[in-house]
Every structure is written in structure tokens, then in C-alpha cells.
Amino acid sequence: MKGDKIVIQHLNKILGNELIAINQYFLHARMYEDWGLEKLGKHEYHESIDEMKHADKLIKRILFLEGLPNLQELGKLLIGEHTKEMLECDLKLEQAGLPDLKAAIAYCESVGDYASRELLEDILESEEDHIDWLETQLDLIDKIGLENYLQSQMDE
């Protein structure tokens, strides 16, 4: 099915954001695990896999619309050097992607591509949930202190 060129451009933009997130979250997961923060590492690993699932759905949709998925233009990863900075980097990445998602959803709606819109709405919901989780973790650090937070993330 021949898709709207601008829809495909939007889908590729979101795909690029997802590819950045996959790599960033995967590296952060391994860093957390290396530091003995098993709970945080496991959660971050699952976030990376979740982003990979989003990327997979986007690739399938782009191909269905007879477009070419762009996996070559990767943006910059935001890698923190300590736990709080890593959480802040992840939050910044998620927040930076929201305007792209909302613009893509609005455009898909305007041209009647409801399947792409629904896919993007599902991704938006997931990203908003992740933002909420990240904000909660940063609030916990502020409330209980970094040392107590780190201790709470050590064992499963």
C-alpha cells in the first residue's frame, strides 16, 4: 500500500528516536548492573527492549507503506556518568521525543492514516509512562537521598 510521503518521514523520525533510546537504555542498563544496581539495571534493560519493540512496529509500518526505514541516521546518545545523571539523561531523551510524536499523530490524523496514528498513540502512551517513572525515581532521590535510593536498587 503506497503511503503518504510525509507520514513515512514522520515514522522515520520517530524510528530514529527509538533507535537512540534502545542504545542509550541498553548501555545504562549494563552500567547499572556493573555497579551492582540490579533492580535499576533490569528495569533499564526492559525499557531498551520496549523501545526495540516500538522500532520493530515502526519498521513494519514503514515497509507496509512502501517506504524505506532509515536506520542509518542515529542521533547523539545522552550517557550519564552516575545514577542521577543517567536518569536525567533518560528523562531528557524521552521529553525531547514527545513533540515529534505529537506532530506525527496530528499529521496522520489530518491525512486519515488512522493505523499509523494508532501505532504512534500507543508509543506516546508508553513514553509518557516512562517519563512518569523517571520523574518518580528522581523525586525519590530528592526525598530519601542518593545513598538510600542506590541501596534500594541493589537487590532483586
Curated annotation (Swiss-Prot):
GO biological process: intracellular iron ion homeostasis; iron ion transport
GO molecular function, one term: ferroxidase activity
UniProt cofactor note: Binds 1 heme b (iron(II)-protoporphyrin IX) group per dimer.
PROSITE patterns referenced in this protein's UniProt entry, alphabetically: BACTERIOFERRITIN, FERRITIN_LIKE
Residues reported to bind heme b: M52
Key words of the record: Heme, Ion transport, Iron, Iron storage, Iron transport, Metal-binding, Oxidoreductase, Transport
Annotated CDD domains: Bacterioferritin
Keyword Membrane attached: no
Residue positions binding Fe cation 1: E18, E51, H54, E127
EC id: 1.16.3.1
Protein task: Iron-storage protein, whose ferroxidase center binds Fe(2+), oxidizes it using dioxygen to Fe(3+), and participates in the subsequent Fe(3+) oxide mineral core formation within the central cavity of the BFR protein shell.
Family from the record: Belongs to the bacterioferritin family.
Protein name: Bacterioferritin
Organism the protein comes from: Azotobacter vinelandii
